[in-house]
């Protein structure tokens, strides 16, 4: 299994257990699904709640959301009120990525710059439809992933987008 981590914060962003598609050599599109999970439902062998008082058992909470977000502890951020603030973040973040690429993979710099401009124009055109997520550390200096819902066979499917060059792959 491969885990993809933010190269700036070290936060786990997603794994290869999902359907992953590379777009224009710069964006990973990861297909998620809406899930509901019960938390706090504890089963103990030999424990018979009916033999106790009437108010026994544990409270259970149902957690609902996109599996990628829940499994990798991503946190929704509302840091970008408008397209302009997101564009400012992107310019700063792209500078950080170019510096990292020049250091570790100089052959990728031109590919990144060329293709990222094309991809970001497309993404900025859909800005109002996007949700934004940071890693568990909630550090906006690192990667802010994007999510949108796309209609596939009459069903809304959550698609998360991550910058390929902002991730490091860890094999388990």
Swiss-Prot record:
Gene Ontology cellular-component terms listed: cytoplasm
Keywords for the protein's UniProt record, in alphabetical order: Calcium, Cytoplasm
Pfam families reported for this sequence: TCTP
PROSITE patterns in the record: TCTP_1, TCTP_2, TCTP_3
Domain of life: Eukaryota
Subcellular location per the Swiss-Prot or TrEMBL entry: Cytoplasm
Keyword Transferase on entry: no
Claim: Cytoplasm is one of the keywords in the record: yes
Residues in TCTP domain copies: 1-172
Database matches in InterPro entries: Mss4-like_sf (IPR011057), Mss4/transl-control_tumour (IPR011323), TCTP (IPR034737), Translation_control_tumour_CS (IPR018103), Translational_control_tumour_p (IPR018105)
A GO molecular-function descriptor: calcium ion binding
Job description of the protein: Involved in calcium binding and microtubule stabilization.
Family of this protein: Belongs to the TCTP family.
Protein name: Translationally-controlled tumor protein homolog
Taxonomic lineage: Eukaryota, Metazoa, Ecdysozoa, Arthropoda, Hexapoda
Gene that encodes the chain: Tctp
């Amino acid at each position: 299994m491969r885990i993809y981590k933010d190269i700036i914060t070290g936060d786990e962003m997603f794994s290869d257990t999902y359907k992953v598609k590379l777009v224009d050599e710069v964006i990973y599109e990861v297909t998620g699904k809406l899930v509901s999970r019960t938390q706090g439902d504890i089963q103990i062998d030999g424990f018979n709640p009916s033999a106790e008082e009437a108010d026994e058992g544990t409270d259970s909470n149902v957690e609902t959301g996109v599996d990628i977000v829940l499994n990798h502890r991503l946190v929704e951020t509302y840091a970008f009120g408008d397209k302009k603030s997101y564009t400012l973040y992107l310019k700063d973040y792209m500078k950080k990525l170019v510096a990292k690429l020049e250091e570790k993979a100089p052959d990728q710099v031109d590919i990144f710059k060329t293709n990222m401009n094309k991809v970001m124009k497309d993404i900025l055109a859909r800005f109002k439809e996007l949700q934004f997520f940071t890693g568990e550390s909630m550090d906006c200096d690192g990667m802010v992933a994007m999510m949108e819902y796309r209609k596939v066979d009459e069903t809304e499917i959550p698609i998360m987008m991550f910058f390929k060059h902002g991730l490091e792959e860890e094999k388990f």
